């Protein structure tokens, strides 16, 4: 298992990785192995709430600041899933720690990203607790975020990759200024499509009539029609007025993905070594 962990880290280095949030599974080999591993890589390990109980200091840097095309992006790491078997490390309240770090970096950066390792129940309050963040990426739950899922209108937006890395979240942000909110146009477009499908299904039953004539006297359906049309119009207005935008999609890591031959060779060799070690 320690070999597996080390080659996963080598794989991250090969494909490119800006930071690793230390959570539940990073402690799979024990705290000593984690610290040794963190010292062998150029990838920053981050955590804003894991404390060395012997020194009462943070175990890792709480965040990193990444610069991309003139933008400064703060990435803050948090967890509340520290294994009980870990003795010399404690996890301080991750909400309190997260808010403290947001306050510390918000005037220094353009975008704040939270990496949060927490169970599903604790993830439900993250957008309310971290309102000054822009993006929240979670682990620790098998839930998968889809574009149509409800999100706060102006963020922060929360995304989860689901079970066993079967998908990868891809989030593209276009930032034209630093004052307007970031608008999730993927949600607005998905909402429009969903409401249009409802109208189309109703229309298919009576193709030669208007919806008003077809469902005359059926108050519930007429109300649904009105709500769907209003939602489509409102989404269209928001799309046209959006200045800073976010596009989100899940990419399935299936056979349609074309393998990078160098990475494929590395993975195949590593798996073969793992199998040899098992035997």
Per-region residue spans from a language model:
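Acidic, metal/ion-coordinating pockets
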Residues: 1-279
């Amino acid at each position: 298992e320690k070999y597996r962990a080390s080659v996963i880290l080598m794989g991250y280095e090969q494909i490119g990785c800006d930071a690793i949030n230390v959570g539940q599974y990073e402690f799979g080999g024990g705290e000593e192995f984690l610290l040794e591993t963190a010292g062998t890589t150029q990838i920053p390990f981050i955590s804003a709430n894991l404390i060395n109980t012997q020194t009462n200091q943070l175990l890792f840097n709480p965040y990193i600041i990444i610069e991309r095309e003139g933008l400064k992006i703060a990435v803050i790491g948090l967890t509340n899933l520290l294994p009980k078997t870990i003795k010399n490390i404690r996890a301080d309240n991750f909400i309190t720690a997260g808010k403290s770090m947001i306050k510390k970096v918000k005037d220094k950066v353009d975008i704040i990203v939270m990496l949060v390792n927490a169970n599903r129940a604790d993830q439900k309050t993250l957008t309310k607790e971290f309102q000054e963040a822009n993006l929240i990426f979670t682990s620790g739950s098998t839930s998968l975020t889809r574009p149509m899922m409800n999100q706060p209108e102006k963020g922060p937006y929360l995304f989860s990759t689901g079970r066993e890395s079967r998908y990868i979240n891809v989030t593209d942000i276009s930032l034209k200024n630093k004052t307007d909110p970031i608008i999730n146009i993927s949600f607005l477009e998905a909402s429009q499509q969903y409401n249009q499908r409802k109208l189309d299904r109703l229309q298919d039953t009576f193709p030669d009539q208007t919806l008003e004539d077809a469902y005359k006297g059926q108050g519930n359906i007429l109300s649904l029609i009105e709500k769907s049309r209003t939602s489509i119009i409102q989404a269209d207005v928001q799309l046209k007025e959006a200045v800073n935008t976010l596009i989100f999609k899940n990419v399935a890591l299936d056979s349609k993905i074309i393998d990078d031959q160098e990475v494929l060779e590395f993975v195949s060799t590593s798996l073969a070594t793992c199998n040899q070690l098992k035997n």
